[in-house]
Amino acid sequence: MKLILREDVENLGKGGELVDVKPGYGRNFLLPRGLAVLANPKNVRELEHQKAIATAKAAKMKASAQAVAKRLAETPITLSRKVGEQDKLYGSVTAMDVAEALAARGLQIDRRAIDLAEPIKTTGDFEVPVKLHSEVVGKVKVKVEAEAA
């Protein structure tokens, strides 16, 4: 019996997959619980249509992320902080600080997307990776300098 899964089913497949199961399993378990629908021509066409829409949407999201990554590379940010001995900062520069600086430049990036391994605690130039998409990682140049006294 051929069925199209509506949801992920353990040891069988993921939602949207076309699977072949024994008739009893399909009739008595999957269909009554709404976990699958019959794989008739109409449902198969609808599945293919949904997959095409999802593929187009994913490509659009990736292209958008690549455009943002290009803009990030062209937008260096400079942060001024109070400095103590040996160019060590009082406090640190965190992902939240980088996100706020980018927002001031017109780029709304979620702070959780900024992949700062540990807060910046010294002055200097840094390249901070930003996860924009599962396949796209942008980099923003961050310059931390001493605040004028």
From Swiss-Prot:
The entry's keywords: Ribonucleoprotein, Ribosomal protein, RNA-binding, rRNA-binding
Protein name per the record = Large ribosomal subunit protein bL9
Residues in coiled coil = none
Q: Which GO BP terms sit in this record?
A: translation
Ribosomal protein found in the keyword field: yes
Q: Does the keyword rRNA-binding apply?
A: yes
| Gene Ontology molecular-function annotations | rRNA binding; structural constituent of ribosome
Q: Which GO terms describe its cellular component?
A: ribonucleoprotein complex; ribosome
Q: Name the protein family.
A: Belongs to the bacterial ribosomal protein bL9 family.
| Top-level lineage group | Bacteria
Functional summary from the UniProt entry: Binds to the 23S rRNA.
Q: Which species is listed as the source?
A: Anaeromyxobacter sp. (strain Fw109-5)
